[in-house]
């Protein structure tokens, strides 16, 4: 790239709990609110956008190309193309990479990229219903589990991959609960200090009676969480296991997006860049330990950027599970005081198609607050992959 490609604005919805405040809205409706909010904040006209690229994992029965639905619902003209991508938990960050590539290749000037997800509205389906079932029980499948949370190669839940990591690294239940409690406590402190306020775009949720409800604060964090309280929970995936609902991320709803363009375009439009996109990398690992994906992805990304872990001022590494996040921290060897300083997905939540963009949005705003220069966003991916993006404030 001969010219810097930058993010000029970033925003996200507050993250909703499963069947919680956002559950009455589809993924496209949540995404529409965020996209409209970004247009309003930047002052960009809808017709100035060249493309919209959004991650969404749970798309069964939601209609053709959800990103296109979001684009038109947000008031962008028919002439603006849109693409939905599915790289499971890495979808929202890969969308930003695709925006970066499109601009670098001269295929677009301004791209909005990110992700959206309603895990609450994911469908149950009846397999082989076109052929019929002549005898016996006929079971429906939960697409949230099958398409979002189930390892297709080993035929078990993502939680089992976390158990595999805990066994491989020797992480105890107590260590995992302590990690999860710390995440909750950091998020509680951040919420009480208003540290997420700037990044959240409020969403109006229609009510059956009266005025719409304004949803503008993450509702998944459990204030007052301690390692002792987490220690009372039963293992979720194995009778003798150590992974519980308390030391794993949540099932959530939300959306997050960024506005990407060249530095010269930002200057032309009078928009101040939040950061430049420095490098991106994807990597593959054994699906049975999919949570280690950020290790090779982050290593490759840092090599491309010409950085080392010690150069990073701030890191957002998605917490799919405590054991998973601990393995990444251990092998990367980075300064833990710089990682997920306001808590991670164990506390904030993990709307899978949106999380890649969510960690990036959170990273960008916290870098501003701390005057940090170099940052990294990274996530593991079900099926055995990882993604990482390096950014630098200018």
From Swiss-Prot:
The protein's assembly and partners: Homotetramer.
Pathway the protein contributes to: Biopolymer metabolism; poly-(R)-3-hydroxybutanoate biosynthesis; Metabolic intermediate biosynthesis; (R)-mevalonate biosynthesis; (R)-mevalonate from acetyl-CoA: step 1/3
InterPro entries reported for this sequence: Thiolase, Thiolase-like, Thiolase_acyl_enz_int_AS, Thiolase_AS, Thiolase_C, Thiolase_CS, Thiolase_N
Gene Ontology terms for molecular function: acetyl-CoA C-acetyltransferase activity
UniProt-listed Enzyme Commission number(s): 2.3.1.9
GO biological process, one term: poly-hydroxybutyrate biosynthetic process
Gene3D superfamilies documented for this protein: 3.40.47.10
Gene Ontology cellular-component terms listed: cytoplasm
Name of this chain's protein: Acetyl-CoA acetyltransferase
Active site positions, chain numbering: 89, 350, 380
Subcellular location: Cytoplasm
PROSITE patterns: THIOLASE_1, THIOLASE_2, THIOLASE_3
Family the entry assigns: Belongs to the thiolase-like superfamily. Thiolase family.
Record SUPFAM superfamilies: Thiolase-like
Keywords: Acyltransferase, Cytoplasm, PHB biosynthesis, Transferase
CDD domains per UniProt: thiolase
Domain of life: Bacteria
Catalysis: reaction(s): 2 acetyl-CoA = acetoacetyl-CoA + CoA
Chief localization: cytoplasm
């Amino acid at each position: 790239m001969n010219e810097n490609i930058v993010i000029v604005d970033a925003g996200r919805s507050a993250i909703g709990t499963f069947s919680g405040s956002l559950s009455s809205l589809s993924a496209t409706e949540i995404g529409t609110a965020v996209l409209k909010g970004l247009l309003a904040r930047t002052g960009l006209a809808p017709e100035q956008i060249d493309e919209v690229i959004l991650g969404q994992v749970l798309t069964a029965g939601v209609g053709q190309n959800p990103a296109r639905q979001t684009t038109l619902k947000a008031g962008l003209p028919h002439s603006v193309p849109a693409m939905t991508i599915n790289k499971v938990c890495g979808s929202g960050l890969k969308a930003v990479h695709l925006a970066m590539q499109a601009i670098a290749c001269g295929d677009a000037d301004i791209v909005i990229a990110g992700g959206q997800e309603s895990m609450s509205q994911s469908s149950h389906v009846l397999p082989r219903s076109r052929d019929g079932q002549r005898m016996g029980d006929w079971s429906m499948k939960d697409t949230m589990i099958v398409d979002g949370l189930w390892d297709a190669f080993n035929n078990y839940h993502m939680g089992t991959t976390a158990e595999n990591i805990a066994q491989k690294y020797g992480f105890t239940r107590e260590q995992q609960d302590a990690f999860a409690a710390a995440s909750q406590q950091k998020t509680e402190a951040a919420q009480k200090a208003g540290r997420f306020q700037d990044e959240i775009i409020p969403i109006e949720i229609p009510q059956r009676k009266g005025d719409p409800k304004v949803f503008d604060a993450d509702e998944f964090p459990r204030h007052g969480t301690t390692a002792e309280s987490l220690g009372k929970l039963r293992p979720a995936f194995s009778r003798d296991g150590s992974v519980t609902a308390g030391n794993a991320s949540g099932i959530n709803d939300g959306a997050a997006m960024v506005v990407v363009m060249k530095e010269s375009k930002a200057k032309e439009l009078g928009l101040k860049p939040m950061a430049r996109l420095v490098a991106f990398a994807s990597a593959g690992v054994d699906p049975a330990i999919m949570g280690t994906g950020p290790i090779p992805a982050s290593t490759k990304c840092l090599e491309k950027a010409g950085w080392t872990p010690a150069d990073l001022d701030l890191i957002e590494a998605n917490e799919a599970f405590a054991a998973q996040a601990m393995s990444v921290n251990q092998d990367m060897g980075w300064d833990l005081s710089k990682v997920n300083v306001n808590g991670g997905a164990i506390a904030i939540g993990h709307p899978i198609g949106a999380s890649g963009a969510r960690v990036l949005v959170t990273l960008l705003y916290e870098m501003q607050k701390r005057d940090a220069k170099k940052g990294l966003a990274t996530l593991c991916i079900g099926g055995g992959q990882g993604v990482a993006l390096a950014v630098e404030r200018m």
